[in-house]
Amino acid sequence: MLPIDVTDLWPLSRDLLIQILEDRCSDRFVCERIWERLGYREVAAGAWGAGPETPAEWSEAFPEAPQLIAERPASVRLTRSIAKPHKQLLKQQLAFPGYRIGELYPRRTRRATAVNWLLAWLAERSEPLMEQGPLAPELPAPSNPVFGHPGDLPVT
């Protein structure tokens, strides 16, 4: 368990996680919710770096906060960091059926991984998922999910 002061973290809620799954917020917002829970801290305007609470396996591989949606190595590490008992939380807690064949894009599947990781983070701390809470700045779903929202980095 990371010694992170949870009062400094953006609150997680069912509504927020659905907003992420429905691609109605920026990739950057999604990354920031995970970075703060991994102990990364904003070190300059828009730049995040590993902090003293960042697990060594993350800070050594990614001294600067990784682009979890845009970059495959970071997404793979995030997937592998979810403990086996928590791999199905997306389906169990949010009744998420997955994406249909025509909806399968790396950005979307990586967002689903991010949501599952956030659910696992709560589960590891025995914290409940709130029904409602603050949402991300609302964006319309992108017209082309491959490219995402204006400002989202290209997926590699």
Residue positions per predicted region:
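N-terminal organelle transit peptides
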Residues: 1-7
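Conserved, aromatic- and glycine-enriched, well-ordered alpha/beta core segments
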Residues: 10-100
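Low-complexity intrinsically disordered segments
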Residues: 59-156
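Low-complexity, disordered linker/stalk regions enriched in Pro/Thr/Ser/Gly
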Residues: 6, 15, 19-23, 115-120, ...
